[in-house]
Regions:
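Short alpha-helical transmembrane segments in multi-pass integral membrane proteins
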Residues: 1-23, 78-143, 189-247, 305-371, ...
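Small-residue-rich hydrophobic transmembrane alpha-helices
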Residues: 50-110, 147-166, 279-341, 375-397
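Residue-level hotspots within pore-lining transmembrane alpha-helices
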Residues: 25, 29, 33, 63-67, ...
């Protein structure tokens, strides 16, 4: 189950490929997880159901983002401890990361479950979509914690040297999701309840697989029993705060997708009604796939960069960074070309050509796809700063990208360009973020030359 990986001495290109291939495949299975839901909901229930799922999606993104935050923070700290031979400290940190993230998501799920009606309205649901939104939330909110466990556990399994097992967690979860989606929606006719329950059960399987690995099969790192003394609890809180600091940008990256969906739902329903939201939901199903691939590239580079940064090997850090940037940009250009050429086929996967939302989506998605190229550079830049413990800088970049520039795009461009401006809001945010990263890069170089 354990793969032969040496972060400190193996050739960087070989090491990166060894991590990248299973990580990308795992993310592809996660993407299948997302796409399957969209296809079954759109074809089996209808475009209104597709719009309703998109309205609830920010909650899923936030839970996953919490998992990513503690996964990044915990794995960066643990990587550096392992490079220094401090295995016990690494074990304590990954355990604290799992405990913290699980507790936060459980509290969030309970609060959301108690207020599903008002929450649906707050997320931007119209009166027509609200019953579908509520039904979906009731059946997936209790299982949100397994989304978090799957997201957090992936980092620690890869850090332990088992990227193939991490891939299998996502793959098996996706397979179960596909099977349950077909049975619950088409065979049993359970509608929104079936779609939510199928996704939840698939995630339960994946989440439990990560926990089983960390408790039974891990080699280098293990879950460590946390003491309940006041001193131990204070230390846990301190370490948790530090992990949050390092991983905040990872959370904001995921939350920015939630922000994009939230703002987009409001703007689209204002300009184009429920059909506009249904069209936008197709882009939102496609966007996380792009995010997952870029995230896989960043996650593959992260343990290499963190380990060698902690070991004082800057040349290996630079090689890993340059390799990640080249890989991401190639993917970004490819995704844009595929989106532009295959937009009708992509949209027809989710809804019938007779739906009013079909033409809206086909006309808008090429505008939306422009941002994929800039998104690639941004994800690697953010991941790099996380990996070298520059969490504050990564957080600033992510906040600008996911909130400030997104708000500017959604509320300014539609006034200037009309409907195309709504679709171009996200690409504008990505472009401005890329320009900001280039700016601080040259500023850093200028400061170094002055010294």
């Amino acid at each position: 189950m354990k793969d032969s990986i040496d972060f400190g001495s193996m050739d960087i290109s070989m090491l990166f490929r060894k991590l990248l291939v299973p990580t990308v495949l795992g993310m592809v299975f996660s993407a299948i997880f997302v796409i399957t839901d969209g296809i079954f909901v759109g074809k089996g229930i209808g475009s209104d159901a597709l719009a309703a799922v998109n309205i609830t999606a920010p909650l899923f993104m936030i839970a996953t983002g919490i998992g990513l935050m503690f996964g990044v923070g915990g794995s960066v700290v643990a990587s550096i401890y392992l490079s220094q031979g401090k295995r016990k400290a690494a074990n304590i940190n990954i355990t604290q990361a799992l405990v913290f993230s699980t507790f936060i998501v459980l509290v969030m799920s309970a609060l959301c479950f108690c207020f599903v009606g008002p929450l649906g309205c707050l997320l931007g649901s119209s009166d027509r979509l609200l019953p579908l939104v509520i039904e979906y939330m009731i059946w997936y909110l209790p299982f949100l914690v397994f989304y978090e466990l799957l997201s957090t556990g992936m980092f620690f399994i890869r850090l332990d040297g088992s990227p193939n097992y991490a891939m299998m967690c996502n793959a098996i979860a996706a397979i179960f999701n596909i099977i349950f989606d077909y049975i619950f929606i088409f065979e049993f006719g359970w509608g929104m309840m079936g779609a939510a329950f199928a996704t939840s059960l698939g995630t339960v399987v994946g989440g439990l697989m990560t926990v089983i690995y960390l408790t039974r099969f891990s080699r280098n790192i293990h879950l460590h029993r946390i003491k309940l003394s006041l001193k131990s609890l204070m230390l846990t809180l301190r370490n948790g705060g530090y992990m949050i600091k390092l991983g905040t940008s990872a959370f904001i990256s995921e939350a920015s997708i939630a922000c994009m969906m939230f703002l987009g739902n409001y703007v689209f329903i204002h300009h184009l009604g429920e059909d506009g939201v249904a069209a936008f939901s197709i882009a939102c199903y496609f966007f996380p796939i792009i995010f997952m691939v870029y995230n896989a590239i960043a996650q593959s580079a992260q343990p290499i960069i963190s380990y060698n940064f902690g070991a004082g090997q800057p040349d290996r850090v630079r090689k890993a960074l340059h390799l990640a940037i080249r890989t991401a940009l190639i993917c970004g250009i490819s995704f844009f070309i595929i989106t532009f050429l295959c937009r009708q086929n992509i949209v027809s996967l989710f809804i019938d050509r007779s739906c009013p939302a079909f033409d809206i989506a086909v006309n808008g998605i090429p505008y939306f796809g422009v941002g994929f190229i800039f998104f690639a550079a941004n994800m690697i830049g953010i991941g790099y700063y996380q990996s070298i413990r520059r969490g504050q800088r990564a957080t600033i970049i992510t906040l600008l990208r996911g909130v400030v520039f997104m708000l500017i795009g959604f509320f300014v461009l539609p006034l200037v360009l009309g409907v195309p401006g709504i679709w171009l809001a996200v690409p504008l945010a990505e472009l401005l973020t890329t320009l900001y990263i280039i700016g601080i890069y040259f500023k850093d170089r200028f400061m170094i030359h002055r010294l």
